[in-house]
């Protein structure tokens, strides 16, 4: 803080106590400028220009001390002594006594010279540059005693690392310096002696002692004759007042405007604020007053230095022992994709810690660059030429994974290229191909290799389940045709099949054996009781080399004249034989399933053809068809337009004759297909005793296809029926344990295949 000596002398001559003290920013700026000339090459000189009250902050003072000394850290311990409390009686006298201010004649003369309407430049030259912008209201004068230690942490850490076990007792650490600084006011002489010894022995620290005011000159008889300093501790605050309160009313507003222009615009323009934005309205001689070119240039240089530091951090990471050791441990006998490298990365704790250290350093660097960029934009928003801002892109873990791949596969002949996992190729410098190494085979699931060939790492050695090795590559195994095991389709087209079903053509009739203990064909019977009948093929006895598909069912039912009976049919289908409990119920007229079609025949009796057409959409395997016939009474409703059915007939008066019923014929429409049970048994045998390498997988693939195609023909429902187990159980005569073993083997094999999804089935056959 600088005092105007001439003004101070005049005021002391007027009053016993200080009545008016003015702070002169002008003299303070000259002092800083003098220092700045001595350090023209310092990178922080751009901060030391005249920018107003900012330079009186404690943070800025600490920064200047630290940067001027060339050290990275500053430790200071001090104590203050408040001797005198100083008040400005000039303002108090004006406020309470109403007397004129006892100001210096030169100050009055400068005010009169300004006139009634001075320009901002005149106010700046005659008042601000001579007397400053503020004067002192109250403060505390006293003394201070302080010890300042400037420390270069890098030199200190290198010195500590270089010390061996025999010199550890004399090595200097930050903890040692903290202890010495804390003991300064307890034992000053020995503390200074030890610190000066460390300063001489090492260039890592510099010690400065400051003693000002009466505290440092306590041996004087008259302390009043000793020059004092302003005490700026929190309990002794300095109170300032704007100089405009001492000026006439007509000058106050213009003075404030001139002071702001002087501080913010360096007297090169007029300071203007509008809509929460402030700027300088530049004068004709200073068109770039809003554009601090020196500051902008310094910030651009800082960004360049940050870029260089960014490159150095990345280079240090690549050259670190952790990175080299991680690269050395990577397997070379198969290709490493980014997922595999990331998995190995997470397993290496040392490498992870080193990468986290790099990330933290980069984050701090990036935040520092962001602050500079934001300030750069703020300073240059009114410049005619915008600054050049170039920041390196932050390198994520994905970049380093690709970088590691480049070191592995694009680092031949002293050239390092860039690897692309998508194209599986390298991009070499100057569009050359000499940096590309031989890529090992890819190990993984599906079509990737199970292992690489030991004699040639670029080719597959073995393949995964469901794939076969072909010329060094793994190709999907395609199951051989299952037509020689079991047939599924007929030669008839859909339209032909539909036409033959409509005509109930005998060419698609499957001849089955009719069996019933309750009735006979072409014979009248009393329908009061439920009748059971079945059509069976007895394939195991007569047609062991065939399986059969049902496409439709037709019955011709006749009733006596004027009968009110209505037949009700329930159909169960047994796919491959076995007991009746292993049959499934046909959901007629449910969930879009076909319904019975009734056609009246041109006969004297009431005869109808009842036809159920399944077609290709609802066709399924059948060995036996169980038909249950019940009857119900049909009568007109109360409105005459609707029918009401009564059942069961067992509870109707036995003496009441409801008529009789007979079934002339029953036909099953469908077709028979080739079936070779011995060949399928031989296929199953290969699961335990494969003929050659790969024949077991081929057999499993064929059995899977047979299983899926058989189960696909199950009736509609939320879950498919397990028809394949019925085929094994009744047509191949396998035991229950063998069926379970085969199904388990198929499920396990299917789970290993790529892009497959198994499905749940409902058990039908025990």
UniProtKB/Swiss-Prot annotation:
Inhibits neuronal cell proliferation by negative regulation of the cell cycle transition. Promotes pituitary gonadotrope cell proliferation, migration and invasion, when overexpressed. May play a role in cell pituitary tumor development. This is BMP/retinoic acid-inducible neural-specific protein 3. GO terms for biological process: cellular response to retinoic acid; central nervous system neuron differentiation; exploration behavior; multicellular organism growth; negative regulation of mitotic cell cycle; positive regulation of neuron differentiation; social behavior. Residues 1-33 form the signal peptide. Keywords: Cell cycle, Glycoprotein, Growth arrest, Mitochondrion, Secreted, Signal. The gene is BRINP3. Transmembrane segments: none annotated. GO terms for cellular component: cytoplasm; dendrite; extracellular region; mitochondrion; neuronal cell body. Belongs to the BRINP family.
